[in-house]
Amino acid sequence: MKTRLAVVFAIAGLAAASVQAQDAVVRPQQTIQFKANAYGCVSKDKLDAADHHAQAGEQQQMQEFFSGYQCVSTPSDSDFRVVRVVGHDVEFVNAANSDTEGLWANDRFIKQ
């Protein structure tokens, strides 16, 4: 019985490690590039709200964030520096400057 339990824990540990290995970790000071059709918002709250509207299929409400310049499209071939990471959201700035506050984007937009 103890052997079976040990095998179950070993398999569960390997499964968890493989999932973690597939999910690339983004860290502050890392240089990143964004995928096509990515966007960033002036605050994490604005990003959360825009993502909520996007996932709900509410295109007009989401578009209002872009019309008011609360969210902007990010170029896919530019380098950005990660300032801060909160869950799956990253605060980023242009890699060429030393700003300490920037825009927020979801890590699903980052090229791996």
Regions found by a protein language model. Name each.
Residues 25, 72-107:
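SH3/SH3-like beta-barrel superfamily modules
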Residues 1-7:
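Bacterial N-terminal signal peptides that target proteins for export
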Residues 16-18:
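N-terminal signal peptide c-region/cleavage motif recognized by signal peptidases
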Residues 22-65, 74, 86, 109-112:
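SH3-family beta-barrel domains
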Residues 11-13:
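Repetitive helical segments and hydrophobic/amphipathic motifs
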